[in-house]
């Protein structure tokens, strides 16, 4: 299993000093970790597009990989729960927020694909879908003047991918993994704080290893 960390240069220090070491400690081989560092400062949307093109040109389209962002902390059983995927059809979300838990329905695990896109903090995507995104973007987004004007240059990488997969594969499912595989700790490492539409911080609905967050906070305080 391969893992791609989507990183901006300002957070590379956290990825190299904390995130990757925590992955190695659980048994993930370094050669299976791809750090996609946005050194060109493309921004989320362009960087996501280029990472999809990289996968299309360099990775097997019969396989898939986990995509995680540079401002997360992984659960203590992250590798155990991500190292194998029973099938290569559905998307798997390792990050689910409280606002999706309506009447407990997210505990059921499997939802229609149109709900998956909010979980780009940690998501498993079959490589064939990321490859198809390149064609879809070039065909539908670039050629649609209004669509391109609305989203070009923005941070709508997750939304654009949601639109792509919903259009091309409307029958696939999103498998939501609870307890969550990661928690969002941008507030500890700086440079952005994401909020949902209700103004609440974008945190995992259920991250069982809160002690890891406390441990990281202490390490970061010592680092300063």
Residue ranges and their predicted role:
Residues 1-68, 72-224:
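Peripheral/terminal regions associated with large enzymatic or DNA-binding modules
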């Amino acid at each position: 299993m391969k893992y791609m960390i989507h990183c901006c240069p300002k957070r590379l220090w956290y990825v190299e000093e904390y995130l990757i070491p925590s992955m190695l400690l659980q048994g993930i081989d370094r050669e299976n970790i791809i750090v996609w560092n946005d050194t060109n400062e493309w921004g989320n949307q362009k960087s996501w597009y280029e990472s999809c093109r990289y996968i299309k040109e360099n990775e097997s389209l019969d396989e898939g990989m986990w995509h995680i962002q540079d401002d997360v902390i992984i659960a203590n059983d992250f590798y155990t729960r991500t190292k194998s995927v029973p099938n290569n059809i559905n998307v798997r979300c390792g990050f689910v927020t409280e606002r999706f838990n309506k009447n407990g329905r997210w505990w059921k695990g499997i939802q229609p694909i149109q709900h998956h896109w909010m979980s780009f903090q940690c998501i498993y995507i079959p490589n064939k879908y990321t490859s198809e995104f390149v064609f879809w973007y070039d065909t539908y987004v670039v050629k649609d003047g209004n669509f391109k004007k609305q989203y070009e240059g923005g941070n709508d990488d997750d939304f654009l991918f949601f639109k792509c997969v919903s259009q091309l594969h409307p029958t696939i499912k999103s498998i939501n993994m609870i307890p969550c595989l990661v928690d969002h700790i941008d507030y500890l490492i700086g440079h952005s704080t994401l909020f949902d539409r209700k103004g609440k911080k974008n945190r995992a609905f259920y991250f069982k290893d809160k002690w890891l967050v406390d441990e990281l906070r202490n390490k970061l305080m010592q680092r300063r």
